[in-house]
Every structure is written in structure tokens, then in C-alpha cells.
Amino acid sequence: CNGVLDELTLDDIKSIFKPKFIKQLKAMQLCGNHGDPIVARDTLEVLQYFREHNPDMWLSMNTNAGAKDDFWWYSLAQTLGQNGRVIFSVDGLEDTNHLYRQNVQWKIVERSFHAFIEGGGRARWDFLVFDFNEHQIEEARAKAKQWGVEEFVVKKSSRFITGHTSEKKES
């Protein structure tokens, strides 16, 4: 072992979160600050473990939806049920999403949305606005409605403001 913890496995989760502890939880959010939750090996099994021990808790997850097969997404929807949702962080359409969500293929994103919603999943689409995708907001909103996405959220980004400098003034 190199001493680096890359991800928590289902066995790790079971040793940390005992059923008695899980029963008193109201919610759990997998947000992906250190990587997308869907690339962790045991994400679905971990969520199933939490659901098994607390059918009423709210379970949610943020993802770019760029991985896993249809069966996985359908199973995730079944696991979350009505007491959970997936927040799909998708920043554009086929020709722009990959500009910020690098290496994410649109066809996989679209397939993931469909399989999850067909499985009964509750979906929210978070759309970060950049210069390269702002012209697509209304088209994406319409697509979200057509697909059965419950909520479409537009988020302004200040990540790449042109002309912004952080130079220090000399005294």
C-alpha cells in the first residue's frame, strides 16, 4: 500500500458506517469534489447499502454522466427511488459540453440521462454558463423538458473571466 486512499470501497463504507448510524441519517450527498462519484468502483453498491439500512433518507449525487452503461443508470434510479436524485452537471450540448467537461462524450451523457429517467429516476440538470455555451441555454432547457428532467438550473460561472488579473499593487 502506498498510503494513498484513492476511493472508499463498499467494505470501507461498511466498516465506517454501521447500520445503526445509517438509520438516523436524513440525507447523504455524493458531490464529486475530488472526482466524479460514478468512476468509483462501488458507488452503486454503496448507495444500495445506505438505502437498505435507511429507506427514507434522501440520497443524491452530482455527476457529469460521462461513464457507466444503461443498466447501471437504470439500477441507480431504482435504488434512489423517489427519495433521491441525480444532479447532472452538463455544460452545453453535443458540440460544447466537452469543452469544460473534458473527455466526456455527449452520446454517453445522453444515454445516461435516458436510462436514469426511464428507470424512474429524478433528474436535475445543472448548466454552467460560459462564453462558448451561453447561446445554448434555451435549447438545453427544451431538451431537458423533452427528456423528463425535473429541474433545469442555469449557473453563471466566473471561472474564466477575461481581463481579470490578480496582480499586487506595489506600495
Please state what every model-predicted region is.
Residues C1-V4, K23-Q24, K168-S171:
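N-terminal pre-core extensions flanking Radical SAM catalytic domains
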Residues E7-C31, A40-K143, W147-K156:
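Radical SAM/AdoMet-radical enzyme domain recognition
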Residues G35-P37:
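Short acidic, S/G/P-rich loop/turn micro-motifs used as interaction or catalytic elements
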Residues V149-E150, K156-S171:
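Accessory C-terminal segments flanking Radical SAM cores
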